[in-house]
């Protein structure tokens, strides 16, 4: 995808915020527990390479990604000796590529290990489906057979075992405890404990520090976003959001009563009013459902009117502004703030989706 460096729309990523979130989390972890930075999906929209560098500077001991290509991108960017785990499914034919690049892979089926062609040792992490229902083995018998397979094959190393909690971001913990118990049953069935036992995502690491095991997978909260609104007031420290999204007005005009804007003419002025066109649209991740949401102009709310277009969006101004005036879509402006949580609430989604949707057509600028 082409990045739009030559238009006035950009994302600012505050590296100091990422470092602070990591340090605050590390301060509550035992020294024996590693923090792995989850940088999948372009670091939740924040930029995988720069975030990985920032996280490593802050003390992260490794990285988690969703697909092998993300792991290879880290290797190509210079992270040659760092621990990297692919959390998602990888094709069998790509196992050798991972092995040669010292990338750890998730294994969740016995048959995946059959007839592998490897030129180097493949490090694997056994995924346990303790109740998430996506990937993973579900019985002690499966776990023991996979352990035996890895023990009998000198090119396989059972480096880790893990699970993922479905409800760690909820205050009610009965299902979480049920998952943890099932995982522990499978863990204790192994003859030898792997080097890395890990279960905690951001929510679990924040609210259930006792289950850190050997490492935590620090994702959404590394970026300063709460895992869910339900637990926001129960967090052990304040999270510092790292992402801000800005643009500028490229056209300002006054509408007369009866004038309409955008596709479908769904918005019609009922009085004289000032509007501005912004060079950002749903092709950038500002999806059509943002219509009716507000941005900030000089600290004042300005609603998005009409339909969001592919490349442009129109807002209603509180008064006349000059072309080139700055607009805050996510971030702080003169004491007021629009957050990813605000957008998520309006869109009936979660903050993860808000930032992940912001694609690479919007340039990232890294500050602090």
UniProtKB/Swiss-Prot annotation:
Gene Ontology molecular function: alanine racemase activity; pyridoxal phosphate binding
Entry annotation: catalytic residues: 40 (proton acceptor), 263 (proton acceptor)
Pfam families attached to this UniProt entry: Ala_racemase_C, Ala_racemase_N
Catalytic activity: L-alanine = D-alanine
SUPFAM superfamilies membership: Alanine racemase C-terminal domain-like, PLP-binding barrel
BP terms from Gene Ontology: D-alanine biosynthetic process; peptidoglycan biosynthetic process
Residue(s) carrying N6-(pyridoxal phosphate)lysine: 40
Organism superkingdom: Bacteria
Cofactor: pyridoxal 5'-phosphate
EC number: 5.1.1.1
Keywords: Isomerase, Pyridoxal phosphate
First-level EC class: isomerase
Pathway in which this enzyme or protein is active: Amino-acid biosynthesis; D-alanine biosynthesis; D-alanine from L-alanine: step 1/1
Summary of the function given for this chain in its UniProt record: Catalyzes the interconversion of L-alanine and D-alanine. May also act on other amino acids.
Name by which UniProt lists this protein: Alanine racemase
